[in-house]
Design a protein with these regions (language model features):
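Long, K/E/R/D-enriched contiguous segments that form extended
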Residues: 296-340, 374, 398, 445, ...
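Catalytic zinc-binding patch centered on the HExxH motif and its immediate surroundings
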Residues: 314-319, 352-371
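Short pre-active-site segment immediately N-terminal to the catalytic Zn-binding motif
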Residues: 319, 370-390
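Post-HEXXH active-site segment of zinc metalloproteases
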Residues: 388, 399-423
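Post-HExxH zinc-binding segment in Zn-dependent metallohydrolases
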Residues: 413-442, 450-452, 456, 530
Length: 600
């Protein structure tokens, strides 16, 4: 057996594969000096308190000064967070992050007056400010975003009470997280050789991918039998969460918790319902995929613990990082040379922290900002790793374009559009790979890779969204969220989504208890809408060429300058209709048909 590759210390990683934090601050001492300097922004804010409605010049002067402050504070945060993530065990950078957090709390408190004061300026007066000071036009979007919440903003005294209550609002999620991640323990299981295997939240999916059905079944039962024994506790967490959301929605004069959550990012409630309806209308594609999985696994009975097992062996070789970059550049060529030039700049100028090292934060992410985005990877030289590079650089270039083309107040895009650029890159990559292979096995592997991603992102997240809607409606009717009600509904949804081709094991009724996303307040549906929008955009780019690419770049450059629905319309996608979701689901169905032919 080959020896396991040793994970290097941070100091042992080749510099060219580390991100250039020196572009933010050349030394830690300069960061410390900048933090001291940033403390002046707190008295600066206090000097403007009570004066924002005084004159056009005062309002403009404050907004400009706040932009400058936010840029400098953003650099401070970027450096401290990136350095901490390089080695999470490094006490020096953990202390630096602690200093940053203390400063951010004080800074946020100092600026708490801004929203109420801007809302308090009457419309005629603000219109007059705009005419007197044309430079305020730059802040029109920011001001309108704040002022559109006027109907949901309370009196000063009531807002103080809401702020105090807000300190408790995270408690259900935090208690649930501590229970799931720190307190709960699952019985060990054993493999065919009698070796003990530990079941944890982290090891669960790898165990579900195990080739031995007995290992999968044992892990499945270990996980869900344990959650079943605590189901009344976990139901109480969610019941408390829903009561918190209902309190906030009613206090702010919303008709429902769904409306309150979506109004914050200017997404119409109908978008949520359209997604669920479109998935329901196309559920036969998922049923067909389940039946294909059953056939390819060669089993008489497919179970819920069989859904993660690979059904096509990995036909691809190892893909080293340097080779992966070249493939990605070719795959994204339809986006034009200007896009590729920025991508190459990111590859060459150390925007990316590539390889795993001792203590490095796990996973992958992109962080936008000045002077350029930063991307964290834990590269493994696999197909999955190549898709991760394409995905995270999609985020990075979205941030790059937004910051380049928008003033600071409009540069940040909302979550509803955040996954579009990253997923668009993934779709272009899989299409390129499929167009450049004649090997049936490799083609089947690539298609299955995409289908699994699609199933997990569109179908699964929509099922979660539907369950979340059920919980909110039940709670809003005045009914407590009991464990039995949650288990019954969750089991019913699994039966509907997966169909008759699978045995829906009774244990799956407990799965809701291990899903942290149900504390995220109508968040997960955006994964499904973002994936669907990306599929539609990638298809336009590949079929319509330059016109579609030009539209897509308008989307990338729009930042937060409009509401998210309008921004997606720039790229030719209207998420107020079911069309983009239907188009994506049609693609899923077509790929299943091709998969069947390849595996016949």
């Amino acid at each position: 057996m080959a020896a396991q590759k040793k994970i290097p210390k941070r100091s042992e990683v080749d510099k060219q594969y580390t991100w250039a934090t020196e572009d933010l601050f050349a030394t830690d001492e300069l960061w410390e000096k900048a933090l001291e300097d940033a403390k002046k922004y707190i008295p600066m804010a206090e000097a403007y308190k009570g004066r924002l409605g005084e004159s056009a010049d005062t309002l403009y002067g404050f907004l400009k000064a706040r932009d400058e402050a936010n840029l400098k504070i953003g650099r401070l945060a970027n450096y401290a967070m990136r350095k901490s993530d390089e080695d999470t065990a490094n006490s020096f950078y953990n202390a630096m992050k602690g200093k940053l957090m203390s400063y951010l709390v004080a800074n946020e408190s100092a600026y708490a007056f801004v929203t109420p004061e801007i809302i308090a300026i009457d419309d005629a007066k603000l219109d007059g400010f705009m005419q007197q000071k044309p430079e305020l036009k730059e802040y029109e979007r920011l001001l309108s975003r704040i002022r559109r919440m006027k109907a949901h903003t309370l009196s000063d005294a009531e807002e103080r009470i809401m702020a105090l209550a807000g300190q408790m609002s995270n408690a259900p999620g935090e208690i649930g997280s501590a229970f799931r991640n720190a307190d709960i323990r699952f019985p060990d299981i054993h493999d065919a050789e009698g070796n003990a295997l530990q079941v944890t939240q982290g090891s669960f999916i790898p165990l579900m991918e195990n080739g031995d059905v007995n290992v999968r079944k044992a892990a499945f039962e270990s996980m869900y039998h344990t959650f079943a024994s605590f189901k009344h506790t976990t139901a109480a967490f969610l019941d408390a969460q829903m009561k918190t959301l209902i309190f906030n929605a009613q206090a702010r004069h919303y008709d429902s918790t769904l409306e309150a959550a979506l109004d914050e990012t200017e997404v119409p409630v109908q978008v949520y319902h359209n997604l669920i309806e479109a998935v329901h209308n196309n559920i036969e594609h998922l049923h067909k995929y389940v039946n294909l999985r059953k056939k390819l696994m060669g089993v008489d009975e497919l179970h819920m613990y069989d859904l993660y097992t690979p059904i096509v062996s990995n036909a691809t070789k190892k893909i080293p990082y340097e080779e992966a970059k070249e493939i990605i550049l070719k795959a994204l060529a339809p986006l034009g040379q200007d896009y590729l030039d920025i991508l190459k700049e990111g590859f060459s100028n150390r925007w990316i922290d590539v390889y795993e090292n001792e203590g490095k934060r796990s996973g992958a992410y992109s962080s936008g900002g000045d002077p350029h985005p930063y991307v964290l990877l834990n590269q493994q030289d696999t197909l999955d790793s190549m898709f991760t590079i394409a995905h995270e650089m999609g985020h990075a270039l979205h941030s790059y374009h937004s910051i380049k083309h928008q003033p600071p107040c409009n540069a940040h895009y909302v979550i509803f559009v955040a996954e579009v650029a990253s997923t668009c890159n993934e779709v272009l990559l899989v299409k390129y790979l499929l167009n450049n292979t004649t090997d049936k096995r490799e083609r089947a592997y690539l298609i299955n890779h995409f289908l699994e991603s699609f199933r997990g992102t569109v179908y699964r997240q929509t099922m979660f969204a539907e369950f979340e809607l059920f919980m909110s409606r039940l709670a809003e009717s005045g009914t407590a969220l009991t464990a039995d009600a949650l288990c019954d509904k969750y089991y019913e949804l699994n039966k509907f989504y997966f169909g008759d081709g699978i045995t829906v094991d009774k244990e799956i009724a407990e799965e809701w208890a291990r899903i942290p996303h149900f504390f995220y307040n109508f968040y997960v549906f955006q994964y499904a809408t973002g994936f669907s929008a990306a599929c539609a955009i990638a298809n336009r780019i590949l079929t319509e060429g330059e016109t579609a690419v030009a539209d897509y770049k308008k989307f990338l450059s729009a930042g937060g300058s409009m509401d998210p629905i309008s921004i997606l319309k720039l790229a030719g996608v209207d998420m107020t209709t079911a069309a983009p979701v239907n188009e994506a689901l049609k693609l899923f169905g077509e790929l299943i048909d091709e998969m069947e032919e390849l595996m016949a």
